[in-house]
Amino acid sequence: MLCLSAFAGVASVAEQKRQNPLKVLMIGNSFSVQMVTAMPPVAKDLDLGLDICSMYIAGCSLRRHWENICAPTTTPYNVTRCIDGIAAKAFSGNIPEVLTSEKWDVVTIQQASYLSWRDETYNPWGGNLVKYIREMLPSAKILVHETWSYTPWDKRLSDWKIDQDEMHKRLCLAYSDFAKQYGFDIIPTGTAVQLFRKRLPVKYAANSLGGDVVGSARFIEKD
């Protein structure tokens, strides 16, 4: 049986029908933005209503998200939204205004990919972000949206003296430790991408939409 495992506890399947779509806000970077196009077809196939919104800056870290909250007069985010498969007009915005514009059921957060494997980069900024979301939207369920490791030939891996598997191992541990501090569930898109890579006869680069299509499978899984 198919279920919205990543959103477990938010609402029942019956409550997710199209007349009452699940409202999801993603505060992230380029590793989350394509979910706006990848997830609606999946939700449609399951006859589930989905209102999904992404606010992102490429390469945006938890620290930068927090610093942007501290400068609310700026609108540095590209905001895209899709309501039951219908795309809304994109606009520039900031976290305070978008977070309070709707009664979001779910808010996802993630670390920048280049910092994701370094656990010391998550706090205090991630904790500040969590506290702010809870204060502004106490009814929302916060989920940690995992990113994935780089391709084996990415120069940054050699600069860091680690390989793809080591980056994946460390980012999983860092995300897990961060989520456990607050009792959050993780959307394990990075793990899904890594498992997919291992099944391929060639090395796989999870670029743009490709990686997110693979990752979106982890929003919905079999019981």
Write out the residue ranges for each language-model feature:
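Bacterial N-terminal signal peptides
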Residues: 1-6
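Sec/Tat signal peptide C-region and signal peptidase I cleavage site
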Residues: 7-13
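Conserved SGNH/GDSL esterase-like catalytic core that processes O-acyl groups on lipids
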Residues: 33-126
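Alpha-helical cap/lid subdomain in secreted, periplasmic
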Residues: 91-223
